[in-house]
């Protein structure tokens, strides 16, 4: 009887950990806290606030600085 309980607990732990790992991998791509922030390096052309990817620094005279 005790062996059946131990096996049941071990199987449940395995199922729960596999389920949690699967969800943590899918959440990682969706989380804005984990995603790397993309920005344009200095010297690249920029167009102010209407561009999709901002400058890493400041957009000055249509160039990132």
UniProtKB/Swiss-Prot annotation:
Query: A GO molecular-function term, please?
Result: calcium channel regulator activity
Q: Where in the cell is it found?
A: Secreted
| Keyword Secreted annotated | yes
Disulfide bond residue pairs: 39-56, 46-59, 55-64
Assigned keywords, A-Z: Calcium channel impairing toxin, Disulfide bond, Ion channel impairing toxin, Knottin, Neurotoxin, Secreted, Signal, Toxin, Voltage-gated calcium channel impairing toxin
Tissue occurrence:
Expressed by the venom gland.
Q: Which residue positions does the secretion signal occupy?
A: 1-20
Prodomain positions: 21-37
GO CC, any one term: extracellular region
Query: Which family does the record claim for this protein?
Result: Belongs to the neurotoxin 36 family. 02 subfamily.
The domain-related comment in the record is:
The presence of a 'disulfide through disulfide knot' structurally defines this protein as a knottin.
Free-text function comment from the UniProt entry: Reversibly blocks N-type calcium channels (Cav2.2/CACNA1B) in rat dorsal root ganglion cells. Elicits no toxic symptoms in either vertebrates or invertebrates during a period of 48 hours post-injection, when it was assayed in vivo by direct injection into mice and cockroaches.
From the Swiss-Prot or TrEMBL record, give the protein name. Hainantoxin-X.3
Query: Which species is listed as the source?
Result: Cyriopagopus hainanus (Chinese bird spider)
């Amino acid at each position: 009887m005790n062996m059946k309980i131990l096996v049941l607990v071990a199987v449940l732990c395995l199922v729960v950990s596999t389920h949690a790992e699967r969800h943590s991998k899918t959440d990682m791509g969706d989380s804005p806290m984990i995603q790397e922030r993309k920005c344009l390096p200095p010297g690249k052309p920029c167009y102010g606030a209407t561009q999709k990817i901002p400058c890493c620094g400041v957009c000055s005279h249509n160039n990132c600085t």
